[in-house]
Regions:
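Active-site helical microenvironments for divalent-metal-assisted chemistry
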Residues: 1-95
């Protein structure tokens, strides 16, 4: 699982470029924040939020929901705070 799979899904769905850009920004922050973290399986941690985001994209949910999925463990598992996410992405995504 990598971001290209999610991005290709979004493109195939003809999502607006600004929606894809929002999701890319969320992925970039999540990828950086979770750098070096592993799942119990040994896989990179980012696989979990990516898989969640892909499932939501396949369900045709909106860009804010997909971005929130990518970021959903950032506040729990990294030094980033909810206030950090709120500043970067707004209240709709950082809830």
């Amino acid at each position: 699982m990598n971001f290209a799979i999610l991005k290709n899904t979004l493109i195939a769905q003809k999502r607006p470029p600004h929606h894809i850009a929002l999701i890319e920004r969320a992925y970039a922050l999540a990828h950086t924040a979770h750098h070096g973290q592993k799942r119990m399986s040994g896989d990179p941690y980012i696989i979990h939020p990516l898989a969640t985001a892909l499932r939501l994209a396949e369900m045709q949910l909106d860009a804010s929901t997909i971005a929130a999925a990518l970021l959903h463990d950032v506040c729990e598992d990294t030094p980033h705070s909810l206030a950090d996410l709120r500043r970067e992405f707004g209240d709709e995504i950082a809830f």
